[in-house]
């Protein structure tokens, strides 16, 4: 499951301040804070449009981003299976050409989901892989293209610029794409998750 933080941070901060001061929080404030945390079961409530033929544009391109070790490749694998099980033609793009074993890991997930994969040698230009994946998707009449990317720290300018290059490569053949960008976060990040979200949102 995922824990989604609502925008009502003020309630959570107020609870923290009263706890630090040794004061009672109060039932109403606690309820507000609890409502600000929404637990979403990914298996029961799809994050994205589900079912074949329900996408405004095809391929429906989903770019998956995040820092190192957050679980991007695993997320791509699970989404691929979800979409394939719903009857969609799915293709995954292995644009993490930096991490050793990243392509092999995505290969395993693609095989489990029964979907095809576009890959390149380690060290290849990830933007080129993304371009080839969109081209292949158009030729094969793919419904959903899932783009896995290398982990990158949000404060590393050159890596964030690389992400922009990937987006531009995707948009050359599919002007409205990527249609969705998913930021995968580690649930233990705390307030750093907000910093990551802001930085990735600016890309």
Task: Please provide the spans of the model-predicted regions.
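Short linear motifs in low-complexity or flexible loops
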Residues: 7-10, 14, 21-24, 33-36
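Conserved catalytic-core segment of NTP-binding enzymes
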Residues: 105-106, 125-140, 154-203
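Conserved Walker B
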Residues: 97-98, 150, 187-188
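Primarily NTPase-proximal linker/entry elements flanking Walker-type ATP/GTP-binding cores
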Residues: 1, 20, 35-95, 102-123, ...
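Generic structural "secondary-structure junction" signal
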Residues: 49-50, 100, 155, 161
């Amino acid at each position: 499951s995922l824990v989604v933080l609502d925008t009502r941070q003020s309630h959570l901060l107020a609870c923290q301040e009263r706890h630090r001061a040794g004061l009672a929080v109060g039932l109403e404030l606690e309820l507000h804070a609890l409502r600000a945390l929404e637990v979403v079961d990914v298996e029961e409530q799809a994050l994205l449009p589900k079912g074949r033929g329900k996408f405004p544009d095809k391929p429906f391109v989903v770019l998956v981003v995040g820092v190192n070790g957050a679980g991007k490749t695993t997320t791509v694998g699970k989404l691929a299976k979800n979409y394939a099980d719903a009857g969609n033609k799915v293709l995954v793009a292995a644009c993490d050409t930096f991490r050793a074993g990243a392509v092999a890991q995505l290969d395993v997930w693609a095989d489990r989901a029964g979907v095809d994969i576009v890959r390149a040698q380690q060290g290849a230009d990830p933007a080129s892989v993304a371009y080839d994946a969109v081209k292949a998707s158009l030729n094969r009449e793919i419904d959903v293209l899932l783009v896995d990317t290398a982990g990158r720290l949000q404060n590393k300018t050159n890596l964030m610029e690389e992400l922009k290059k990937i987006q531009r490569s995707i948009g050359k053949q599919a002007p409205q794409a990527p249609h969705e960008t998913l930021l995968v976060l580690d649930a233990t990040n705390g307030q750093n998750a907000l910093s990551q979200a802001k930085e990735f949102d600016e890309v």
